[in-house]
Amino acid sequence: MAIVLDGKCLCYHGPLLYEAKVLRVYDEKNQTITSKDYKDVSIDDEKVEFDRPPEHMRQGQCYFVHYQGWKSSWDEWVGLDRIRPYNDENLELKKSLVEKARELKNNGGKKKSGSRPVGRPSKVEKGKKAASRTSNSGSGTNTSASSTSASNPASSSSSGTTAAASSSDKSDRKKATPVLNKRSHPKIHIKVPISLRSVLVDDWENVTKDRKLVQLPSERPIEHILSQFYADTSNSTSSVVEQAQLSEFLQGIKLYFNLSLGKLLLYRLERIQYAELLKAHSEKQYTEIYGIIHLLRLVTLLPEMMESSNVDDQTAKILVKQCDILLEWIAINIARKNFPVDPYINTSSQYEGVALSM
């Protein structure tokens, strides 16, 4: 059975094949798009509103597909490397890929050295614990039990894995960041407003308990948020020095985010999504794709990052002050609904099985 408009197909999303429906077909020779509602419409025709193929896919045949049972936010263009005809042979392949994924999940403890078994917290999960301590001591208040749970995902896992994960966390942290034990300046505290702590707790529960993902690309990416913050904040000071410091601070935030996203800021469930976004938006910086949730994850980890670097005390004080101002500004704008928190989307059981075994 060939791949036809409005017909069934199978598409790779990560390592698995999923049933999908072809909504649009792109003809690379004529640079046109065909759907149920229109035929051979030029890709440059602005009168017709539709999602166009990314630039890097326009040199070949591609299809706009909807994954059966998934929300339309997952609809996307796929090339010939990811799409397969809906036939018995490929259905068998789909089945075998699912079985292999299950085997990998069940034998997680036998994976190659250096991989993280299911149940072990990722670096962002470890970071939530440190971020919670930082925000608590900076604000002088105690968090609720749910906040404690969010800051330490291992505490919500089975009792058999909690102690091992805790011990392993300490060992991993010593190996990864030896400088943390040799601080030459006082411990750095950032004041995280209570409302933002609640956002981070909800974020942890949505991803780790409810198996949801932040909907990406964000409607208000970090680039937009920080540009708005600069516009609002720079107007309140006439000091050239302070404006220069603010600009440098925001450039540093963007740099930190783009460098640390894949290493520090993602839960395991998010890694397939991350790989897909990287492939679909290779021309963009992460700050142009991710939004407020991931920015908050970064800012709450900045104390640890600063402590492990060679930042002098004076610079650290300036950075802490700017972080406090940024977080307060974010809290106010969320409360005023100037920009909402990014929505979450559900994942399929197959996606979860593969993502959590990585």
Swiss-Prot record:
Residues 8-84 form the Tudor-knot domain. Residues 184-356 form the MRG domain. One of its GO terms (cellular component) is Rpd3S complex. PROSITE patterns: MRG (PS51640). Residues 103-184 are annotated as: Disordered. Pfam families: MRG (PF05712), MSL3_chromo-like (PF22732). The keyword Cell cycle does not apply. Signal peptide: none annotated. The keyword Cell membrane does not apply. It is found in: Nucleus. GO terms for biological process: chromatin organization; DNA repair; regulation of DNA-templated transcription. It comes from the Eukaryota. Residues 132-168 have a biased composition (Low complexity). InterPro entries: Chromo-like_dom_sf, MRG, MRG_C_sf, MRG_dom, MSL3_chromo-like. Keywords: Chromatin regulator, DNA damage, DNA repair, Nucleus, Transcription, Transcription regulation. Component of the NuA4 histone acetyltransferase complex. Belongs to the MRG family. Involved in deacetylation of histones, chromatin assembly and chromosome segregation. May act as a transcriptional oscillator, directing histone deacetylases to specific chromosomal domains. Component of the NuA4 histone acetyltransferase complex which is involved in transcriptional activation of selected genes principally by acetylation of nucleosomal histone H4 and H2A. The NuA4 complex is also involved in DNA repair. This is Chromatin modification-related protein EAF3. The lineage of its organism: Eukaryota, Fungi, Dikarya, Ascomycota, Saccharomycotina.
